[in-house]
């Protein structure tokens, strides 16, 4: 019985869970400016909805400031109105050819709520790992012999791998919580 086949499949699915966690954590604003905050904002550009990062150069000149410089100066008002409509909680400051977004430092209460949301994301990731584990068990039962030693070995290896993956999730969540709570 070869556990490595199952382990490889589980780790591939776990990588998808980590990517999902990363995307969810990007949505949690820590007060620092990051271009990823603007992912998902679409601008009405000549009749088609276009992602903002395809219309402008986005940079971080200061830790709490995003600078957005549209490639086409005529689209600056459209970009600013799309940012306003996105409910980021930031008012764009429009200059001649650049838009500045200044993010306020989150209060203690807001940081605690963000840390709580980070924990919820971690719990959801653990649930996803449990689903992956269950799928692996079902696949093993369907494809394996009925030798009791093989079943015990598989179960032990699967439990160890699940614990390892959950520890990795906890480490990522702990790091994010520290990041959020840092003033």
UniProtKB/Swiss-Prot annotation:
CDD domains: RRF. One of its GO terms (cellular component) is cytoplasm. It comes from the Bacteria. Keywords: Cytoplasm, Protein biosynthesis. NCBIfam families: frr. Belongs to the RRF family. This is Ribosome-recycling factor.
């Amino acid at each position: 019985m070869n556990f490595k086949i199952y382990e490889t499949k589980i780790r591939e699915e776990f990588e998808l869970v980590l990517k999902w966690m990363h995307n969810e954590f990007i949505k949690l604003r820590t007060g620092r400016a990051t271009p990823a905050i603007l992912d998902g904002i679409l601008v009405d550009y000549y009749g088609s909805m276009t992602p903002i990062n395809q219309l402008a150069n986005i940079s971080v000149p200061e830790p709490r400031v995003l600078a957005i410089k549209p490639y086409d100066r005529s689209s600056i008002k459209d970009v600013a109105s799309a940012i306003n409509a996105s409910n980021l909680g930031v008012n764009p400051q429009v200059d001649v050819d650049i838009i500045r977004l200044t993010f306020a430092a989150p209060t203690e209460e807001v940081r605690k709520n963000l840390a709580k949301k980070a924990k919820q994301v971690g719990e959801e990731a653990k649930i996803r790992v449990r689903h992956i584990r269950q799928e692996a068990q079902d696949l093993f039962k369907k494809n394996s012999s009925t030798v009791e030693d093989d079943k015990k070995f598989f179960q032990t290896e699967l439990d160890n791998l699940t614990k390892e993956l959950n520890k990795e999730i906890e480490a990522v969540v702990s790091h994010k919580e520290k990041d959020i709570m840092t003033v």
